[in-house]
Swiss-Prot record:
Transmembrane segments: none annotated. It holds the Pfam family Bac_DNA_binding. Heterodimer of an alpha and a beta chain. Belongs to the bacterial histone-like protein family. This is Integration host factor subunit alpha.
Length: 104
């Protein structure tokens, strides 16, 4: 079920083909958007893209884990993780249906 992996170059080419910017301008646009998303996430902000989904940074507290091979308990330090929550529109599109756009 694995499909093609879309790269920055693929996104740049899609912008070039659909928007009509030069390849250089398309690459700059893609880099700017991705950079802004990264900057927002690094500062702890949620990035919400309507009809696509939300990127959310969550704090995970300190906890005790276990080495599966030895069974020895290991302390896992607190950390920040990023999660993606797809919108209902994206979920429906992936599953072949059409959903009404929402603000997720």
């Amino acid at each position: 079920m694995a499909g093609k992996t879309v790269t920055r170059a693929d996104l740049t080419e899609a912008v070039y083909q659909r928007v009509g910017l030069s390849r250089t301008e398309s690459a700059a646009l893609v880099e700017t958007v991705l950079s802004e998303i990264c900057t927002c996430l690094a500062s702890g902000e949620t990035v919400k893209l309507s009809s696509f989904g939300s990127f959310v940074v969550r704090d995970k507290g300190k906890r005790v884990g276990r080495n599966p091979k030895t069974g020895v308990e290991v302390a896992i330090e607190p950390r920040r993780v990023m999660v993606f929550k797809p919108s209902n529109v994206l979920k429906a599109r992936i599953n072949g249906g059409a959903a009404e756009p929402d603000d997720e």
